[in-house]
Design a protein with these regions (language model features):
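S-adenosylmethionine-dependent methyltransferases
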Residues: 1-122
Length: 122
C-alpha cells in the first residue's frame, strides 16, 4: 500500500514494465493488522508525529511475530534504539530532490535476537 497517489501510479507502472504481478493499494494501513508475516516499510520516518505512530504500529506487529523490515536513508525520526541493521548500501539519489548523487541506505529490522537473523555494525 502507499499513501501517495503519484507513488501508487509509479509502482503500478514499474510492475507492468517488469512483468511483475502486483497489487498496489492507495491506502493508509497504519494501525491495521491483517496477520501479515512480513511487513516492509520504506522511508517513513520523516516527521515527528507520523514517525511515532508508525513506530508504535510496526513495533506491535513485531511483538506479535511479524518480521518488520525498514528501508531508510537516514531520517531524523528513525527509532534506531529499537532496530538492528540488516544491510547497508550506496543508493542513487533522486537528482534535483537531493543534495548528493549517492547516499547510504540501510535496511533495518526491529530487534529480535530470538529470530536468529544476523546483526551488522552501523
Amino acid at each position: 500500500t502507499e499513501i501517495d497517489a503519484f507513488a501508487v501510479h509509479a509502482a503500478r507502472a514499474n510492475a507492468r514494465l517488469n512483468d511483475v504481478p502486483m497489487q498496489v493499494l492507495h491506502a493508509d494501513l497504519v494501525g491495521c493488522d491483517d496477520g501479515w508475516d512480513v511487513v516492509l516499510a520504506g522511508d517513513v520516518f520523516y516527521e515527528t508525529e507520523a514517525g511515532a505512530a508508525i513506530t508504535d504500529w510496526l513495533e506491535s506487529l513485531h511483538d506479535r511475530g511479524a518480521l518488520v523490515l525498514i528501508g531508510d536513508p537516514g531520517r531524523a525520526y528513525l527509532p534506531k534504539d529499537k532496530l538492528s541493521i540488516m544491510t547497508r548500501f550506496e543508493a542513487p539519489r533522486a537528482g534535483d530532490l537531493e543534495d548528493q548523487d549517492v547516499g547510504a541506505a540501510r535496511v533495518w529490522r526491529f530487534s529480535a535476537p530470538s529470530r536468529g537473523l544476523p546483526e551488522l555494525e552501523d
